[in-house]
């Protein structure tokens, strides 16, 4: 018995210690019996920050949020059985949004598998193709070889999570009872440790000089170019993309998640209203570029994606440091396997300064005309959902974070988050674009990002109410703006809206919930606002005081649709007039 406890303690102690040596210092733990030894060791290790979350589905997204904000791997730990299955949605999101998670599941030992033992199921490859690596760990043994094995496996799994494309990995730990480690053992954390940590150093792909010369030569003869920036994890992309735009004269179509629309860099070449003006069919048909250079994930904007598809005669250069480039439009003619930063640096160094031409001036002109029209909604007194975004940005302090939920909030952020000299970081879950786990992800991000404001619809808010517990347990600061249109507002913009007979029951889905009581149950403050001045004041108050603050603004789905369409129609008239003026 003592040999088992000693082996368990040293073997798992070596694993936990190696995680911290590799800078995996945050773990989200859901309570359970079989995971007891790992949980206790993690709690005991001075280098590990532990976060408890009872609901595994919420816990998975909470860890995802920390990892997204910290840009470092975060560990997840749960017991065996369906607890592990509840991580699945967060693992899927992490895989497609390229976020490193270290998923740790405890398991029954081999003699208790497939024999009807309680809380035992097949956990081999549980997450299928949504993890970069699955490893079944060996049972604990008291030997130097096994302690080295624990550390080396940790090094491999963490390295894999961090290598491009980053993503989740899964370690399954079978353990036998008894499950309590012996903390009185000497040198508990030192077994298998060498003087040097086995860190896998990730290098940058260097583009061959011949290719750079060829690229620069071609670009210098392509006047009509665009730089399209989607969701990007590189903090420096704003500086380098804008420098490349200045050299080439190519406008930057900046998705809000690129974080190029705000900050202290030069935004002369940044186009922020393309989602609206690219709805103009004539413009989409007649504005044909020579080259499109794309960084990061695909943009939120559907009209931009349609525009990209129509650029059949252009050279499409997709820059992606992994072999899994993102091109749902299926138009890539050239894939450069390098980081966005390295690509920009190489091109900037050798690129001559190209003169601004009619192409870039045309994009800038239409963008400004569109923005002038869209800004008319800032005078609206009615509860327009687009104004939620502009008014939040108006009161957010420097270095704040705006987290946009999926469905309508991220689309309104795309349309109404205009360029700003304030440094505001925008986040969202755009891997598989689900409405689940949004509260939990935002709360995870708030561990690192403070202040943080989440904009979320009422259905998405309902979907992850359990996530609010993290704010109470870990004393987190967050302001949540609930845009309550009593249902699925996005469906009013889709063809389903025309099927009136079944629209409300199948798509509108009003649920008629009063969220005030549940917010107070989790120790938060709740405010239902009745005007824009009160709205701005409540958001401002939330960002300057501690704790959980929920601000609800009630809107009408039909009225919101009408206001969006009115703005689009006005913009189309302005664009048509501008295009006619240019053609004379």
Swiss-Prot record:
It catalyses: isochorismate + 2-oxoglutarate + H(+) = 5-enolpyruvoyl-6-hydroxy-2-succinyl-cyclohex-3-ene-1-carboxylate + CO2. InterPro entries: DHS-like_NAD/FAD-binding_dom (IPR029035), MenaQ_synth_MenD (IPR004433), MenD_middle (IPR032264), THDP-binding (IPR029061), Thiamin_PyroP_enz_TPP-bd_dom (IPR012001), TPP_enzyme_TPP-bd (IPR011766). It is an enzyme of class 2 (transferase). Keywords: Magnesium, Manganese, Menaquinone biosynthesis, Metal-binding, Thiamine pyrophosphate, Transferase. Its EC number is 2.2.1.9. Its cofactor is Mg(2+); Mn(2+); thiamine diphosphate. PANTHER family: 2-SUCCINYL-5-ENOLPYRUVYL-6-HYDROXY-3-CYCLOHEXENE-1-CARBOXYLATE SYNTHASE, PROTEIN PHYLLO, CHLOROPLASTIC. This is 2-succinyl-5-enolpyruvyl-6-hydroxy-3-cyclohexene-1-carboxylate synthase. It comes from Bacillus cereus (strain ATCC 14579 / DSM 31 / CCUG 7414 / JCM 2152 / NBRC 15305 / NCIMB 9373 / NCTC 2599 / NRRL B-3711). The lineage of its organism: Bacteria, Bacillati, Bacillota, Bacilli, Bacillales. The gene is menD.
């Amino acid at each position: 018995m003592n040999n088992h406890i000693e082996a368990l303690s040293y073997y798992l102690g070596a694993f936990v210690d190696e995680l911290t040596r590799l800078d995996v210092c945050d773990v989200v733990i859901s309570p359970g019996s079989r995971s007891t030894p790992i949980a206790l060791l993690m709690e005991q290790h001075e280098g590990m920050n532990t976060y408890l979350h009872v609901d595994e589905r919420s816990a998975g997204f909470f860890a995802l949020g920390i990892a997204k904000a910290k840009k470092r791997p975060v560990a997840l730990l749960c017991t065996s059985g369906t607890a592990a299955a509840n991580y699945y949605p967060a693992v899927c999101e992490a895989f497609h949004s390229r976020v490193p998670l270290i998923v740790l599941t405890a398991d029954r030992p081999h003699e208790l598998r497939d024999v009807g033992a309680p809380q035992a199921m097949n956990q081999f490859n549980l997450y299928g193709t949504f993890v970069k690596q699955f490893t079944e760990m060996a049972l604990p043994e008291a030997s130097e070889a096994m302690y080295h094995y624990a550390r080396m496996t940790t090094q491999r799994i963490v390295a894999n999570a961090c290598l491009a494309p980053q993503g989740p990995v899964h370690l399954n730990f079978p353990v036998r009872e008894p499950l309590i480690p012996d903390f009185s053992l000497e040198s508990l954390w030192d077994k298998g440790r060498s003087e040097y940590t086995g860190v896998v150093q990730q290098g940058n792909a260097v583009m061959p000089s011949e290719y750079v010369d060829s690229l620069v030569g071609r670009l210098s003869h392509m006047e009509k170019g665009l730089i399209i920036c989607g969701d990007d994890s590189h903090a420096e992309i704003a500086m380098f993309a804008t420098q490349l735009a200045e050299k080439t004269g190519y406008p930057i179509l900046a998705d809000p998640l690129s974080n190029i629309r705000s900050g202290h860099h030069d935004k002369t070449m940044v186009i922020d209203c393309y989602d609206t003006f690219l709805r103009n069919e004539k413009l989409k048909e007649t504005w044909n570029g020579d080259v499109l250079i794309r960084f990061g994930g695909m943009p939120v904007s559907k009209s931009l994606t349609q525009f990209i598809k129509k650029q059949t005669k252009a050279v499409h250069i997709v820059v992606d440091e992994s072999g899994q480039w993102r091109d749902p439009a299926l138009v890539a003619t050239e894939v450069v396997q390098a980081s966005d930063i390295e690509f920009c640096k190489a091109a900037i160094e050798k690129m001559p300064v190209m003169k601004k031409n009619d192409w870039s001036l045309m994009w800038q002109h239409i963008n400004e005309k569109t923005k002038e029209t869209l800004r008319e909604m800032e005078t609206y007194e009615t509860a327009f959902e687009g104004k939620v975004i502009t008014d939040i940005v108006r009161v957010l302090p420097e270095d704040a974070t705006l987290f946009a939920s999926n469905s309508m909030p991220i689309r309104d952020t795309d349309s109404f988050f205009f360029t700003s000299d304030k440094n505001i970081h925008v986040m969202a879950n755009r891997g598989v674009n689900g409405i689940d786990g949004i509260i939990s992800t935002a709360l995870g991000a708030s561990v690192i990002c403070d202040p943080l404001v989440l904009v979320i619809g009422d259905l998405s808010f309902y979907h992850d109410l359990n996530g609010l517990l993290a704010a109470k347990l870990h004393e987190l600061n967050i302001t949540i703006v609930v845009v309550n249109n009593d249902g699925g507002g996005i469906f009013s913009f889709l063809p389903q809206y025309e099927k009136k007979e079944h629209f409300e029951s199948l798509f509108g889905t009003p649920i008629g919930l009063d969220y005030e009581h549940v917010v107070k149950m989790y120790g938060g403050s709740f405010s239902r606002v009745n005007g824009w001045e009160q709205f701005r004041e409540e958001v401002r108050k939330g960002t300057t005081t501690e704790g959980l603050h929920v601000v609800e603004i009630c809107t009408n789905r039909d009225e919101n649709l009408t206001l969006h369409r009115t703005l689009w129609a006005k913009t189309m008239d302005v664009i048509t007039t501008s295009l006619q003026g240019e053609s004379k």
